């Protein structure tokens, strides 16, 4: 059978095979009136780009025969005839969908009620950490003769004790609630699930980021039940089932690693073992599901994903999403592990203990100038019209007083952190260093300052103020650079050119640790280059000008990148062309007027200060009611009051953000706005307040409960019944639609906006019913995921892409999963 491509004209080739017929028809609708030839290049001849490639793949998938065509196929083949050959070689039969029965509403809500009863305890314990030093300071400064210096020292001591107690409480809760977990498959919303969930929430509450990269971290994991060998270095990891993690001697684990050995799929909790054998190496931003292993000297490279049941053989290197063998590891080329004396190891442990307490104190001390300033405002009766008002009036009064005081707190914290960094440590230099060296210890403390700032000063990121913060820490940051919440940054090694853009959660130039050695190399992102959300930029990377690294993508080797390139995926593939937004004037993207700079600075200043002002205002208001109970030594009443206030504060944060979202933004709809416009500032402000207030104080406790979808629906999402959500990573809420009984695991993200070309583009994400999203999988805007689809870990669904119903996909970008 031969047919002419519809509407393509006489210059088109005649489609002959089944693949050509489908391809020519799809191309004719994408490029009406253009000749369709077998030797034509989709990008250079037809003018295709990344968005059109996704649309073409989606159009072809309408035919079940071609449901497994991928965007990567189009990028790699390019020529129309070659793409048609891929279609003709497609398998004739698709895998049959797996039938499963979602848990009943009775089981779900029975567990939900039990979870709701546990929430006040969890929230109150978090509240105690910052209310206890508040209480101590005001208890000891109630009389004119009291010593402010003594009250300050006592408050710091109580804060540090509360910080240490958080670890102890998390440890005790884990063993009391769940004991030792065993691998297996358990019903979702059952007893084992509830116990795992409660223990996971309690362990998550401990500030483990303070231990990252230190020799204290393995001790903490052992205390929680993991089997950890000697000479193990762990940069930073999330572990979902500690009892099922086994790490051998000499293992190195990078930053931002996710050991997702507990996940929910098809109405069941899957608990599996993860084993890293002696001298294995796990790169940064790796995801490992349960029932996975890495053999001796095996290497799993950064930004890779290992799905359930996979294993890296001894001495092999695996890379990518999904991870595949890329060669042998040269053990002979690995330098010998440096010998370290027991005395040095003991001294390092003491240094890390001191460093943890120092960093914790550093980010707490600036609260005292805030106390002094508010107390002075109070004695001067600055706001007399609030005198004699009730609790709400007191709260409003202290919020207004706390606003300028919180600005002082933030500035003092930034300056104190920078001062410590420069007074104590010189500028780090590139090179290879032993992990048991003074250079490593210096790098660790500098990294801890930056990492702690992500938790304490999170509002600064993605604002006009973030470049100044990085410069204070030692990074070289060009004019008009935009930097969001980058991770793993070694400031002395980082250079960002003018007008660069670093999106959320980018792992940016972190050190590489392997075999007892740490390597640091300069990382450069040049003029107007862009790194997308969740991207990985290895240390030593030099990105030329105008380069774009896509969402969840790795930067390729320096020798492969040229000016203006676009790279996507893990491993990365080169995109010959991408969709670009034109028409926005540079005055709204790269060259704003002084007035716009001032306006944005004011809006972002308010968003930075507000979370701290709310905390301080609530703290002062609570103290007014709490002090009389303490004076009467009614300690039982004090604890009960704290429990009630803790839950009220948590829910209040959520209700405040929900009200602000509807009042300020209304309902999100599809749109595109240049970065230097009020809509973008306000939208990003709501997102920042959500991530800084509602998410940590309320939403994160609802992860894994039937209450989280209801909370998101109040914010504007459309989430069906029975949806399981272990993620809070949603921003433009009204643009998210999730069908009934779908399962979104940890870090899964329906991403409703992108900032390419400094234009904020927002559109809908539609996820069907009974869809499974694995850990850190992402669906970009304008994409549709069909019913019963399965997305593996670290899978990226491109914007405009359509994932067929009842199909399995894995990879970055998504490709058919043969599992």
Predicted regions and their residues:
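Secondary-structure boundary/capping signal
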Residues: 34-36, 68, 91, 144, ...
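Phosphopantetheine-dependent thiolation modules in NRPS/PKS and related acyl-activating systems
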Residues: 1-99
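Residue-level marker of regulatory loop/turn positions in helix-turn-helix DNA-binding domains and
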Residues: 15-16, 209, 273, 458, ...
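Terminal amphipathic alpha-helical/low-complexity segments used for targeting or macromolecular assembly
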Residues: 81, 94-225, 314-474, 559-716, ...
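N-terminal alpha-helical segment
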Residues: 35-36, 67, 213, 281, ...
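Alpha-helix initiation/capping motif
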Residues: 12-16, 72-76, 106, 210, ...
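Structural signal for interior beta-strand "rungs" in well-ordered beta-sheet cores
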Residues: 221-222, 227-325, 470-471, 476-574, ...
């Amino acid at each position: 059978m031969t047919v002419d491509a519809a509407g393509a004209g006489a210059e088109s080739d005649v489609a002959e095979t089944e693949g050509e017929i489908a391809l020519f028809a799809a191309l004719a609708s994408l490029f009406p009136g253009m000749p369709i030839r077998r030797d034509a290049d989709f990008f250079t001849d037809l003018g295709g780009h990344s968005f059109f490639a996704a649309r073409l793949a989606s159009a072809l998938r309408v035919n079940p025969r071609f449901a497994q065509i991928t965007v990567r196929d189009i990028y790699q083949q390019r020529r129309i005839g070659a793409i048609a050959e891929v279609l003709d070689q497609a398998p004739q039969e698709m895998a049959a969908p797996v039938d499963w029965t979602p848990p009943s509403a009775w089981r779900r809500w029975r567990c939900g009620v039990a979870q709701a009863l546990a929430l006040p305890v969890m929230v109150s314990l978090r509240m105690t950490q910052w209310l206890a030093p508040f209480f101590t300071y005001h208890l000891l400064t109630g009389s004119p003769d009291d010593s402010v210096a003594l009250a300050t020292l006592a408050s710091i001591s109580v804060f540090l004790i509360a910080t240490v107690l958080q670890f102890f409480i998390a440890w005790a809760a884990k063993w009391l609630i769940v004991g030792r977990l065993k691998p297996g498959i358990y019903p979702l919303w059952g007893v084992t699930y509830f116990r795992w969930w409660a223990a996971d929430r309690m362990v998550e509450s401990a500030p483990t980021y303070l231990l990252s990269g230190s020799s204290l971290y393995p001790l903490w994991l052992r205390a929680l039940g993991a089997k950890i060998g000697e000479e193990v270095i762990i940069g930073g990891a999330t572990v979902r089932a500690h009892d099922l993690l086994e790490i051998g001697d000499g293992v190195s684990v990078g930053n931002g690693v996710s050991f997702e050995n507990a996940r929910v799929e098809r109405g069941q909790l899957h608990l599996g073992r993860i084993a890293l054998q002696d001298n294995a190496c796990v790169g940064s931003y790796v995801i490992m599901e349960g029932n996975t292993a890495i053999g001796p000297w095996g290497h799993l490279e950064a930004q890779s994903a290992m799905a359930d049941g996979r294993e890296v053989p001894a001495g092999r290197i695996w890379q990518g999403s999904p991870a595949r063998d890329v060669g042998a590891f040269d053990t002979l080329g690995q330098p010998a592990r440096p010998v370290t004396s027991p005395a040095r190891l003991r001294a390092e442990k003491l240094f890390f203990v001191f460093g943890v307490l120092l960093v914790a104190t550093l980010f707490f001390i600036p609260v005292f100038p805030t106390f002094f300033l508010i107390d002075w405002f109070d004695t001067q009766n600055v706001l007399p019209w609030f005198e004699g008002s009730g609790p709400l009036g007191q709260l409003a009064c202290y919020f207004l007083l706390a606003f300028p005081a919180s600005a002082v707190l933030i500035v003092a914290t930034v300056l104190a952190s920078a001062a410590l960094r420069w007074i104590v440590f010189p500028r780090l230099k590139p090179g290879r260093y032993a992990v048991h060296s003074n250079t490593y210890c210096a790098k660790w403390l500098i990294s801890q300052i930056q990492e702690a700032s992500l938790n304490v000063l999170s509002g600064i990121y993605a604002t006009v103020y973030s470049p100044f913060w990085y410069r204070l820490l030692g990074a070289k940051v060009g004019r008009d650079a935009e930097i969001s919440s980058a991770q793993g940054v070694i400031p002395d090694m980082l250079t960002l050119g003018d007008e660069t853009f670093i999106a959320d959660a980018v792992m940016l130039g972190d050190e590489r640790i392997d075999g007892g050695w740490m390597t640091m190399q300069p990382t450069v992102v040049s003029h107007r280059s862009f790194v997308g959300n969740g991207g990985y930029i290895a240390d030593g990377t030099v990105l030329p000008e105008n380069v774009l690294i896509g969402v969840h993508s790795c930067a390729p080797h320096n020798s492969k990148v040229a000016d203006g390139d676009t790279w996507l995926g893990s491993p990365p593939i080169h995109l010959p062309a991408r969709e670009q937004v034109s028409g926005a004037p540079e005055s709204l993207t790269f060259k704003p007027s002084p007035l716009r700079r001032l306006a944005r600075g004011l809006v972002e200043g308010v968003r930075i200060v507000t979370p701290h002002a709310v905390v301080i205002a609530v703290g002062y208001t609570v103290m007014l009611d709490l002090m009389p109970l303490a004076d009467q030594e009614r300690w039982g009443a004090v604890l009960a009051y704290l429990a009630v206030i803790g839950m009220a504060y948590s829910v209040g944060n959520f209700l405040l953000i929900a009200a602000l979202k509807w009042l300020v933004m209304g309902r999100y709809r599809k749109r595109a706005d240049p970065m230097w416009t009020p809509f973008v500032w306000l939208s990003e402000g709501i997102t920042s307040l959500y991530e800084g207030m509602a998410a940590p104080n309320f939403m994160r406790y609802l992860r894994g409960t039937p209450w989280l979808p209801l909370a998101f629906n109040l914010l504007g999402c459309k989430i069906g019944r029975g949806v399981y959500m272990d993620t809070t990573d949603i921003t433009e809420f009204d643009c998210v639609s999730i069908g009934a009984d779908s399962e979104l695991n940890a870090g899964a993200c329906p991403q409703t906006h992108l900032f390419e070309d400094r234009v904020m583009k927002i559109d809908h994400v539609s996820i069907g019913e009974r869809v499974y999203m694995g850990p850190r999988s992402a669906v970009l805007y304008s994409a549709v995921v069909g019913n019963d689809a399965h997305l593996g870990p670290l899978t990226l669904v491109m914007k405009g892409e359509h994932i067929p119903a009842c199909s399995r996909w894995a990879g970055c970008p998504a490709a058919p999963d043969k599992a």
